[in-house]
Amino acid sequence: MNKKNALLIYPEFATSFWSFKFTLQYLGKKSSMPPLGLLTLASLFPEDYTLRLVDMNVRPLTDDDLRWADLVCTSTMIVQRQSLEHVVTRAKRAGKPVVAGGPHPTSYWEDIADVDYFLLGEVEATFPRFLRDLEQGTAQHLYVPQEKPAITQTPLPRYDLINLRDYSSMLLQFSRGCPFDCEFCDITKLYGRVPRTKTNEQMLAEFELLYDLGWRGALFLVDDNFIGNRRDALRLLRALIAWQRDHHYPFNLCTEASMNLVEYEELMDAMVQAGFTSVFVGIETPTPAALIATKKKQNVRQNDPEYPLHAIHTLQGKGFEVMGGFILGLDGDTPEVFDLHIQFIQQAAIPMAMEGLLTVLKGTDLYYRMEREGRLRGDTTGNNLDTLLNFVPEMPEETLTAGYKRVLNTIYDHGLKNYFERCWTLCQNLDRSRAPKPMQTPLRSPEMLRFALASMKQLMSAQGPAYLQLLHRVITHYPNLLWEVFALAAKGYHLRKITEQVTAVDNFKRYLTREVDNLQAEIARRAQDGNKSIRAYVRDVVAHVRKEYRAIHKDFRHHIEDARKTFMNALGTSLKERHLSMPMRW
C-alpha cells in the first residue's frame, strides 16, 4: 500500500481582541487555541495517509511542507481569508491539489479562486466520500452535505498532531447548533436550530485523551450555546463532575452560553461543580428595543428592563467570570448608545468586554434584509475591529466610528483605570465558595509564575498606579483571587494594545483621506511660490506619513494598505502633472 501525504494547514488569524497575542508573549505561548476542526478532520483520514499539521499561528508554512504533500487541506473562518489566499497561491505554485472547508468557504466558496475541492458545512459524511472519489479519479469540485450529521459518531480529535505546549488553552466541542435565531448571527444557518450533542462516553474519552497527553489548565468548550440542549448539558455535567473529582480537577473550564442560563439554578450549580470558572455571553447591547429588533429576545424580560445587568451579576454570584460580546451600529442605535455601553460594562463588572462594530455576514437574516433595503456594501473582512463597514448604518458613519473608538478608549483607557475598577468590582461580586476546593484558585504553578513576571512589567508602566491599587485591595480583601487578577491584568495589557492600534489605524486612514482631498489645492497654492515650496510640502507630508505608518504595529498595517496606496498614487499623479518626481520610496 502506497502511503499518501496529507498536509493540513490552518491559515493565520489577524491580530484581534480574541487572539490575545500580547498576553501570549508573557506566557511563552504561540497561540491561544488549536485548530479543532482540522484535528477532527484528521481523524477521518484512513490509515494509508500520513498526516502533518501546520498551524500558521504557531509556525510558518515552508516550501518543504508543500513539497512533502500529496494533498493540501485547509480550514478557515472569514477572518483568515487573506492568509488562505496566500496559502492557495503557494500550494498551486507547488502543483498541489487544495481542499478548502470551514465556515468561510461554506458561505463564500464562489469568491475563492484556485481551490480544487470545496467541502461545505459539516464534513463527517462528505469527507470520506470525497477521499474515495479522489482515489478513483472522480472527485467533484463541490461537496454539500444533504443533512446535518449526528455528531455521536464524530471521532476523537488528533491532538497528537500538535505540540500542546504551544497553546494557552485546549478546545473540545460537545454540541453544534443553537435554538435561538438572532438576526445577525450565522450559527443557525451553518449548524441549525436543533442542537446536536455528543454522548457522555465520547466527551469523557476526549477529556481523558487530553489528560493522558499531559494537558492541565484551561479548556474551552466551543459550543455555539452550551445550554442549547439543557437536558443533554445536564446529563454531561453530572458525568463530568465525577470525572473531574476522580482526576483531581486538572481542567478549569470555559464555554459560551445564552443569558437565560441564569434561569436554571440546577444547570449553573452543576457547571460550577464540574469546574467551569468563566462563561462568554452575547450581551450585544443594553437597549431592549435594539435587542428585540435584532431578534435577541432571550436577553429581554418585559418585567425587568435591566435583565442583562441582573443576569450578569447572578452569574458572577455563582462564581463565573463573565466575558461579554457587544455590538455597536445596530438599527435603532442613537448617539446615546455609546455612553449606555460604557455605563453597562462598568456596572456589570465585565473586564473583558469584546466591543465590535456590526458585521453583516453572508447568509444571515440581516444580510438578506440589508440586501432588500439596498444597504449592503460588499463582503466583510470578518474582523470586528475593522472600522470599514460593509453596510450603510442608520447612524451617520462618522458618528458611529468616532463613538466606537471612544467606547474602546474608555473601557480600555491608557492607564487601564476603568478596566482595573471593573476587575475590583468583579472580585467583590465573584463567589467561588461553592466551587470544589481545587477550583477556587484555578491557575497552575507555571502560569502563576509567568503572570507574576508580567505584573512586574505592568507595574512599571502607565498602568502601574491603577494596577497597584487593585493588587493592594485584592491582597487585603480577596487573597484567594490574586492569581486570577494577575491573569486579568495580563489580558488587560493586550486589550489596551489592541485598542491603541485600532485607534491609530482609523486615525491614520482618515488623515490620508483628508490629505488626498487637499492635495490638488495645496500643491496649486504652493505652486505660486515655485517648485521649491511644493517639494518642501511633499517632503513634510511624506515624512509625517512615514512616521505614522511605522508607529503602527506590523500586524495591523494591512488595514491601511489601500489608503496608503491611494495617497501615494494621488501624490504621484499631482507631481507628474507638474513634471516633478516622487520622493524616495518608504
Model regions: which residues?
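Acidic, low-complexity intrinsically disordered segments
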Residues: 2-215, 407
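Radical SAM [4Fe-4S] cluster-binding motif and immediate context
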Residues: 155-323, 330, 334-343, 371, ...
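Structural recognition of alpha->loop->beta junctions
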Residues: 110-129, 270-278, 342-355
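Flexible glycine/acidic-rich beta-alpha junction loops that bind and position SAM and/or redox cofactors
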Residues: 13-20, 107-110, 230-231, 289-295, ...
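Acidic/polar loop patches that form or flank catalytic/metal-binding clefts of enzymes
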Residues: 140-143, 219, 252, 323, ...
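A structural motif corresponding to the C-terminal end of an alpha-helix
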Residues: 41-52, 213-214, 274, 310-322, ...
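Radical SAM enzyme core and accessory elements
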Residues: 2-8, 50, 65, 386-586
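Conserved beta-strand positions
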Residues: 8, 74, 221-223, 281, ...
